[in-house]
């Protein structure tokens, strides 16, 4: 998404500076107008933000386990007796978000982690069998495993949710509407020329991702 945003905004004279923060902090910084927007947002993550009309792709939220686990995700009831690992501030699905809110104070059922590199930590916790399952977007997981060697690939135990994913802009920033419109126009242009598919393919993503 960063490469797509850079190409689109460069055409309008903007430089995109990407900074890596924990998700909850990213949302807070955007709300304080200290950054312009956040990458990879579902509408449930930040309903108060300004969203473009066009999504950047589709998020597919998977439930991952230790490679030797045989457990399958079949809805919330299948989480009984399991510890679900999640990242602070993320939205996963309406169903999972309610479950997390209900049990966020019960570490036997929901374990919330944060920080600038939570995915690597989550994979280590899975490998050490300190948690049962971890929720993450499939494309993010695939990219991370390609870019970071040394992590044992987890096992996908089921898909919990699919939803459009966006770059979202702070509602308090007076230029957020303009940035959202530029992004929409740029995405349409890249899709029409085929450039969007080329960028996605460089990350192992298809048109639908």
In which residue ranges do the predicted regions lie?
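Hydrophobic/proline-rich hinge and linker segments of small-molecule sensing/allosteric domains
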Residues: 53-74, 167-170
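A ligand-binding cleft/hinge motif common to bilobed small-molecule-binding domains
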Residues: 25-31, 40-49, 98, 132-161
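Periplasmic-binding protein-like
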Residues: 59-61, 149-184, 204-209
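Flexible hinge/capping segments at coil-to-helix
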Residues: 66-84, 99
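Extended ligand-binding regions for polar small-molecule ligands
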Residues: 2-11, 77-85, 90, 169-206
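Extracytoplasmic small-molecule ligand-binding "clamshell" domains
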Residues: 1-49, 115, 183, 189, ...
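Alpha-to-beta junction loops
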Residues: 14-15, 31-40, 82, 118, ...
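Ligand-binding cleft/hinge of the Venus flytrap
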Residues: 5-12, 54-56, 90-116, 123, ...
């Amino acid at each position: 998404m960063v490469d797509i945003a850079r190409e689109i905004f460069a055409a309008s004279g903007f430089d995109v500076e990407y900074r890596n923060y924990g998700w909850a902090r990213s949302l807070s910084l955007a709300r304080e107008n200290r950054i312009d927007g956040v990458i990879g947002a579902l509408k449930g993550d930040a309903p108060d933000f300004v969203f473009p009309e066009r999504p950047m792709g589709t998020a597919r939220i998977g439930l991952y386990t230790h490679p030797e686990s045989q457990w399958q995700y079949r809805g919330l009831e299948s989480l009984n007796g399991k510890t679900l690992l999640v990242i602070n501030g993320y939205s996963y699905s309406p169903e999972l978000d309610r479950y997390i809110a209900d049990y966020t104070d019960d570490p036997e059922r929901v374990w919330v982690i944060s920080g600038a590199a939570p995915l690597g930590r989550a994979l280590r916790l899975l490998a050490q069998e300190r948690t049962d399952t971890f929720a993450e977007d499939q494309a993010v997981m695939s990219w991370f495993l390609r870019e970071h060697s040394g992590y044992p690939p987890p096992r996908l135990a089921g898909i919990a949710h699919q939803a459009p994913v966006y770059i979202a802009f702070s509602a308090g920033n007076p230029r957020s509407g303009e940035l959202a419109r530029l992004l929409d126009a740029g995405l349409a242009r890249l899709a029409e020329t085929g450039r969007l598919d080329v960028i996605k393919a460089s990350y192992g993503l298809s048109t639908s991702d």
